UniProtKB/Swiss-Prot annotation:
Disrupting the ure1 operon causes loss of urease activity, decreased resistance to low pH killing in vitro and decreased pathogen survival when inoculated in BALB/c mice by gavage. The gene is ureC1. The lineage of its organism: Bacteria, Pseudomonadati, Pseudomonadota, Alphaproteobacteria, Hyphomicrobiales. Carboxylation allows a single lysine to coordinate two nickel ions. This is Urease subunit alpha 1. It comes from Brucella suis biovar 1 (strain 1330). HAMAP family: Urease_alpha.
Amino acid sequence: MPARISRATYAQMFGPTVGDKVRLADTDLIIEVERDLTTYGEEVKFGGGKVIRDGMGQSQLSRAEGAMDTVITNALILDHSGIYKADIGLLDGRIALIGKAGNPDTQPGISIIIGPGTEIIAGEGKIVTAGGIDTHVHFISPQQVDEALNAGITCMVGGGTGPAHGTLATTCTPGPWHIARLIQSFDGLPMNIGVFGKGNASLPGALEEMVRAGACGLKLHEDWGCTPAAIDNCLSVADHFDVQVAIHTDTLNEGGFVEDTLNAFKGRTIHSFHTEGAGGGHAPDIIRVCQYPNVLPASTNPTRPYTVNTIAEHLDMLMVCHHLSPAIPEDIAFAESRIRKETIAAEDILHDMGAFSIISSDSQAMGRVGEMIIRCWQTADKMKKQRGSLPDDRPGNDNYRARRYIAKYTINPAIAHGMAHEIGSVEVGKRADLVLWNPAFFGVKPDMVLLGGWIATAPMGDANGSIPTPQPMHTRPMFGSFGKARTNTSITFVSQAAMDEGLREKIGVDKQLVAVVNTRGGIGKHSMILNNAMPQMEVDPETYEVRADGELLTCEPVDVVPMAQRYFLF
């Protein structure tokens, strides 16, 4: 005879189910469980007196007979594809199955086999997301990897050589020698990583050798001269090798205006960095490029969201990042031309409309690498409070908005950079780069981060404690961050040309190299999931007012944001 329990009791035991609602951190964003792939009455749970015991929820089947390496039980999955509850089976560092776990000898409808060789991660009451992907990283210091991983980032794409002045300002690694050294360093870092080569050149030879040396993309930056000739040449090389191009355009409009840059694109796919303009780009109207089908528009977290402090902090940041001097009037004018409250306010709304597709950090070069996810959800919360529910959201939940915003740092950057066959979503066949969150700490402090199916970092108490939880409790590296586990659970993204030339053996790295694919004509703005709006854009050159399809885009700065100081008292 079936037993009945209250929803509250059920959620406490097995996590929320269909119709239950969950608040994300201390925001006003509410998600609702859309479907449940587990079976009522047959839920599996680990622990004393619980289900996953020999002959009960645990079968006799070996790994060779189909048992999983790891099962995450009763997880609430938050993904661009939906918000649903399921068990997740991991095998060989990948997501093997999503569905119902247990013992097929004693339970009906089992798709995920738990055997004696299966580890269990309790997902009850936890939210599981794909690891975040940050596609705007200045590799200034290796310590960024620790900050990013502990914030839920599992892939970093960018360039640099350390605290050299070229790297402090620009997101690229110049030349094959530097690229080789950087890729060699990745063996010591628990993170999936890709490198941008420098894209600023008017002839192809130097760019081609960087792609062959392992660059998975090329970066055009105004500080190296972002001329129409350089743009055209860089895109031509990228088309030949199937790698993405990221661009930071000409703030001073010296080599041309935004129309000249658009003409140089010639309709070819390109990833536009900090499209709002405060981070750089044609002043004052680079924001217009988000209307074009070949432009994949992103913005960075220093302007996310628009607050009462945003304008004030930007000027000094910009002077440091771009090697400018406060004693030179022209340098000050350059900096001030980029900081416009009108376009920053419009940026909030364009993200909420789905016209801006990607959020990234701009790490240590105006942005904060550990705050990319926080700033994304702060923007979503601000927009809900100022603009209300989205038309596609159902009454009582913010599922559509949540899916739109999580896509900005998971699936869309993966698609943009040819990595979506490996990462970017909670999907069967992809790498098990997963983040577990306590809903109260969602987006702020992960409960656990898995890289390639193994735990890389997690909150942990005193190692001499009698249990794992005595203070001081803070995020620490786990076994997945050490030794050869580190090189066997994370990868380096490179070009197919580098793979063909045997780069791994040539430079002697242990990490697996994986080629990026489909970064050029096969993708465009239409490929940006839940973020493919292309409104007709106008920018007033005198007032900087921004309009989309004739509507003025403006919003007030806020003086309080969620996911902030209350989470960082200790």
